Amino acid sequence: MGGHSHWAGIKHKKALLDSKRGKVFTRIIREITIAAKMGGAELENNPRLRKAVEDAKAANMPADNIKRAIMKGTGQLEGATYEEITYEGYGPSSIAVIVDCTTDNKNRTFSEIRKIFTSRGGSIGTTGCVSYMFKKKGLIIINKETISEESLMDIAIEAGADDIKSESEVHEVFTAPESLDIVKKALEEKGVKTESATLTMIPDTETEITDENAAQSIMKMMDELDDHDDTKAVYSNYNIPDEIMEKISK
């Protein structure tokens, strides 16, 4: 299905392209802290921490900031205690929405995320109310200018990837969650430069939005959720046709 879906192409580059560098740094620091807390400070033995540190370096984060975040996670330095929490619910036109957050105050975060849902005509539901509509996948983004789809297909499938999809500017390589790091390494060993590699939630089916007002409400809600300080990632199952996106983007 053509059009603009929340998990396609451009959204995956948001963290590295976001002009609000302070917000990007905050999110990465929280991820480093949690990863170090859960899996220890050794990058070789902690894939999640290794990925977070790679993201930090790609965003030009100073090495001292990275080191301090790791030390806070392992308890060597004092700092805020962050928890991971996921909210599920429905947005405009009954689209399914999942919001992953990291927070040092669950009550505050819940109140603020709920307000975004309700202000756009949506509602937060109970755990599991929409997540069954999605599958967790590893996703690797590769610039289309660096390799052809055919060449990438051969390398990626041999490396253990599940599927490949080419968007307008990037190739998307999908993997099982546990295979993400392995496939990424295998691609890079073959000389394939990856732009990002992350875990994501892919909807089983998409809801096509053909009404301009509904599309506008959805995009405003997505932007507000994306921009919230505690938000780590937002997933949804909407698909807005390109012609509608062009109209509401003017």
From Swiss-Prot:
Gene3D superfamilies: 1.10.10.200, 3.30.70.980. SUPFAM superfamilies: YebC-like. One of its GO terms (cellular component) is cytosol. One of its GO terms (molecular function) is DNA binding. GO terms for biological process: regulation of DNA-templated transcription. Pfam families: TACO1_YebC_N (PF20772), Transcrip_reg (PF01709). It is found in: Cytoplasm. Its main location: cytoplasm. Keywords: Cytoplasm, DNA-binding, Transcription, Transcription regulation. Disulfide bonds: none annotated. It comes from the Bacteria. Belongs to the TACO1 family. This is Probable transcriptional regulatory protein Emin_1151. The lineage of its organism: Bacteria, Pseudomonadati, Elusimicrobiota, Elusimicrobia, Elusimicrobiales.
